[in-house]
């Protein structure tokens, strides 16, 4: 993907998103959509995601984060565009 089409989002997901496999599901979703970046749990029980892809793919990714996990209950999802770092994969950080 070239630099003109690559976008990056910093996402904070709040709700019942820890202890339900959300990070592993997010990584699987990202790999299926060819999204690059990372996901990690935060101390306040939210989940932080950095995601890089084209605009349409990021839209699909964010929609799925909000609506498609079978056990999570997303109460809020906040995202902001950030500078792309050029991730080469999608990983879970601890």
UniProtKB/Swiss-Prot annotation:
What InterPro entries does UniProt report for this protein, alphabetically?
Acylphosphatase, Acylphosphatase-like_dom, Acylphosphatase-like_dom_sf, Acylphosphatase_CS
Molecular-function annotations in GO: acylphosphatase activity
Task: Provide the coiled-coil residue spans.
Answer: none
Q: Which UniProt keywords apply?
A: Hydrolase
Acylphosphatase-like domain residues are 8-94
- Catalytic positions are 23, 41
Q: Which domain of life is it from?
A: Bacteria
Matching entries from Gene3D superfamilies are given as: 3.30.70.100
Catalyses: an acyl phosphate + H2O = a carboxylate + phosphate + H(+)
EC numbers listed for it are 3.6.1.7
Record family assignment? Belongs to the acylphosphatase family.
Q: What is this protein called?
A: Acylphosphatase
Natural source organism: Treponema denticola (strain ATCC 35405 / DSM 14222 / CIP 103919 / JCM 8153 / KCTC 15104)
Gene symbol of the encoding locus: acyP
